[in-house]
């Protein structure tokens, strides 16, 4: 049955390891499945859609791994990915969405103190990488609209974390500042189950 969607997916490495996908009701002007750097394009982590009004980048940011073994790689990734997104934003307003694998502030993680600089996703290196997006003109639109709201988008499957709501907010919409006035609403839909992540949404008006 046709649902009138245009789809594109990207997965290069082992099945189940990484990958991104976008479904759209409108055919994009352009689809690109990499950032143009071999060292970062081996895991299918970025998908770019160019639309009439904005660019859309779907991302699955690398996890720094157990014992932070990939933290150096993650630091390099953050720099190169920001450069990529900044160049897109210079051409057209840009939305970046997906799993950023970082809890940006204490409000974004249920257990900040025991995880800080010990767990992947909550090191100062990763926090600084996210800060750089903000200092370069991108807005964490959920936190912009909900400065004090505690809501998470990911829970570890272990320790019944979902049932106890011991979670992390690591899934984001980062938008060019020029899109701020187009935002109607954004939400974290933690009422939905079926994954260790829950959906997030962004409503725009043009």
Which residue stretches match the model-derived regions?
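Conserved beta strand-loop-helix elements of the APE1-like EEP
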Residues: 16-31, 149, 160-181
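Surface polyanion/phosphate-binding segment centered on an Asp-His-Pro turn
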Residues: 187-206
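Short acidic (Asp/Glu) patches
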Residues: 8-9, 31-47, 73-82
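Single conserved hydrophobic/aromatic residue that forms the stacking wall/gate
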Residues: 1-7, 12
